[in-house]
């Protein structure tokens, strides 16, 4: 009899836990995805803060030339970063127990892998948690679909790109200047500015910002005046009412006269779908572009594509971009035996082996 009571009590505790996890009445919804999301994001955040402040230099290139990224080693908020794991580690999974000592793990950039793996798992679970909460509230699932855009972008730069390049040392450093360095090197090696998917991503991000500002200003400018209890609702709206609190017809008429009639939406659902879909699709394309360039399917090459009647090159902005990329790549490849292939495999240039005579 005692055993039966204990089993019922344990089952009751489990049921209470399940109800608490999946309850939509909590101040913050946890959900089953949250059971994984909370510890992984806490781990990633804690390790990032500690590494950003106090991590020792990391041998990122695998040539015994450590790069310091933490605040205690002379960096500031702008220049500091969690340096990616060493090129000597490559794509190997490198947890703490795989290193001979903690010093070796830190020297080879182990904290970077710890942060990005827990971070990616955490944001994946955050996406699943958005779907889970929408499902339990009877909502449509488009919130998590929109969130998949930044998730795919983070996955591209932290996971897909290092896999394609063969080493986690090619991943994006976790810092402001490190992000800029990643962008410069990416342009130098893959010519991302000439890739159509990157162009679509730029249109998505900047276009989404423009449309968001336009929409917010139009709605704010066409709000219906709030009424009191002694006034008719025909003069405005009542706080908490279910109907829209702004006049979309007025906003549509204003914008249609400002540009032209068919440049504005007179349907609220179409308008908000457009506002959501435009930046999301653009960022999806950017993530796909980074993922394809990870395997060296690079941007277009229009270098020296315009010649005059005598075969001489007429410089274009594509040539300027190419020369800038070559310069950035030379500065990036500090290792002499890893000279950029697109420079080492060019046409032979005549070299003067004897100093010319100077007739004074």
UniProtKB/Swiss-Prot annotation:
Cellular component, GO, one term: photosystem II
Residues making up the propeptide: 345-360
Positions of Fe cation binding: 215, 272
Post-translational modification as stated in the protein's UniProt record: Tyr-161 forms a radical intermediate that is referred to as redox-active TyrZ, YZ or Y-Z. C-terminally processed by CtpA; processing is essential to allow assembly of the oxygen-evolving complex and thus photosynthetic growth.
Transmembrane segments: 29-46, 118-133, 142-156, 197-218, 274-288
EC number: 1.10.3.9
Name used for this protein in its record: Photosystem II protein D1
Originating organism: Microcystis aeruginosa (strain NIES-843 / IAM M-2473)
